[in-house]
Curated annotation (Swiss-Prot):
It comes from Brassica oleracea var. alboglabra. SMART domains: B_lectin (SM00108), PAN_AP (SM00473). The keyword Lipid metabolism does not apply. PANTHER family: BULB-TYPE LECTIN DOMAIN-CONTAINING PROTEIN (PTHR32444), S GLYCOPROTEIN (PTHR32444:SF89). Glycans are attached at residues 43, 125, 180, 243, 396. This is S-locus-specific glycoprotein BS29-1. GO terms for biological process: rejection of self pollen. Keywords: Disulfide bond, Glycoprotein, Self-incompatibility, Signal. Involved in sporophytic self-incompatibility system (the inability of flowering plants to achieve self-fertilization). Residues 356-437 form the PAN domain. Residues 1-28 form the signal peptide. Disulfide bonds join 387-412, 395-397.
Amino acid sequence: MRGVIPNYHHSYTLLFFVILVLFPHVFSTNTLSPNEALTISSNKTLVSPGDVFELGFFKTTTRNSPDGTDRWYLGIWYKTTSGHRTYVWVANRDNALHNSMGTLKISHASLVLLDHSNTPVWSTNFTGVAHLPVTAELLANGNFVLRDSKTTALDRFMWQSFDYPVDTLLPEMKLGRNRNGSGNEKILTSWKSPTDPSSGDYSFILETEGFLHEFYLLNNEFKVYRTGPWNGVRFNGIPKMQNWSYIDNSFIDNNKEVAYSFQVNNNHNIHTRFRMSSTGYLQVITWTKTVPQRNMFWSFPEDTCDLYKVCGPYAYCDMHTSPTCNCIKGFVPKNAGRWDLRDMSGGCVRSSKLSCGEGDGFLRMSQMKLPETSEAVVDKRIGLKECREKCVRDCNCTGYANMDIMNGGSGCVMWTGELDDMRKYNAGGQDLYLKVAAASLVPS
């Protein structure tokens, strides 16, 4: 009697498909080799180690397309199983694909995105020397990189998406620029709308000229908000940064680059990103894998006093006074009539002229957002006492402060023009010393 021979082939095939359906991440990859391609039709994606980020194609709604067709983009998003998909990077934001046809592949040591007619719509355009073969890789931190076969260092890339931010700053990304002029300036630029990733009206950019560096939020070319200068611990105009216990802020200022970045410390379950929204707010957003709902941790401009130059020169904004704009002691409204009508943008003027000598004094204002630094000079070698003496000798000096607040304070910042865009905080601000006429120091 012949026995029954089990059909193991069909059993293994069935088991394979069960595993594929239940555990798709087991078969996911984070690399793209020269003989591979990602296409819209294949619906294939790259998934980062740790399953946090995913790279692939996505489309926006047809109402954003003048010709009524779908617009397709190559992007990176958080890989979550529920909720609204959150995009953190878009390759071809200003050059969409149409007709549901697009291909990403490696060609001549560069990543190239081709449309339906095999015309490039986006490319990394690498022009250096590369050792073939070249591989593209989506890293655990969300950085999409291109590296050659002889690169052994984990942080050496031919090209990386972190050098080309869109509207989102992730941990380990940088905003700023190289001092030698090489590379692009790294800024955040909003989407045109919540469903249109093309370049929008708002940007967040680091001022890298001179010795003091601060971020500006711009609406096209118009300044909307200023963070205040970096003071060794945080940006002076963001006191709440001192309460960001799980975020390590880093500011790099050397002969190679000027840049800001951050990392999330001690709790890798928390995911954090900075986002320049299409409505004009710089947002700090957090979420966890266990609770995928997004939490708006912080957003600015936060209030009226955050608005750029809302009170004009020689005036400061205080959310705890009415009106919120106040002339500095020793100054009066430049236009009293407009001031009474709550139009305070003209600011204030001195009630008594400076004598440019020993007759002048200094008014200490505590918990302040320091004035705009475009008219400031810096001397890192001296402290506050020497800074005061230097300001006394300079008839153009209008005020001074410490450059760095660490270890009791160091460095000298001295203003030689109008003092503008100031505000007073309850806590977390900085001491500012304003030069005033002796008559203004007499108790009223």
